């Protein structure tokens, strides 16, 4: 084999590899859309209807905090839910969507002067 044919094969292999990576990247899903705050309790209860133990307790904590409009507590509770072991892919996506909506509301509360909401936001920033 000549160095030219080896080099040609190398370039073709690299081009094929690049093409595969590009194609795989094109199939990425869009980021999850947030849900409305009013829908979160129902969605969580439906999505976790068979949950037991700490997962069920975390869902209850989120729903209770939302009903009380306690945004800092809801944010901490949804974060706790997100760290529970054994969540299915659909449950993880639901939690991510709920987290976006809750944290957006908490940001509004912090901007309106809710000191506890601002403290929780600062903790979230430090954890990143």
How would you label these PLM feature ranges?
Residues 33, 40-80:
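Post-signal-peptide N-terminal segment of Sec-exported extracytoplasmic proteins
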């Amino acid at each position: 084999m000549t160095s030219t044919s080896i080099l040609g094969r190398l370039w073709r292999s690299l081009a094929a590899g690049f093409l595969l990576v590009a194609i795989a990247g094109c199939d990425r899903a869009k980021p999850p859309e947030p849900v409305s705050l009013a829908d979160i309790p129902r969605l969580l209860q439906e999505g976790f209807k068979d949950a037991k133990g700490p997962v069920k307790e975390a869902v209850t904590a989120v729903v209770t905090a939302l009903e009380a409009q306690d945004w800092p507590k809801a944010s901490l509770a949804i974060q706790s839910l997100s760290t529970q072991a054994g969540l299915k892919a659909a449950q993880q996506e639901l939690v991510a969507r709920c987290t976006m909506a809750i944290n957006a509301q908490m940001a509004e509360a912090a901007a309106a002067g809710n000191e506890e909401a601002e403290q929780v936001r600062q903790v979230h920033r430090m954890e990143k």
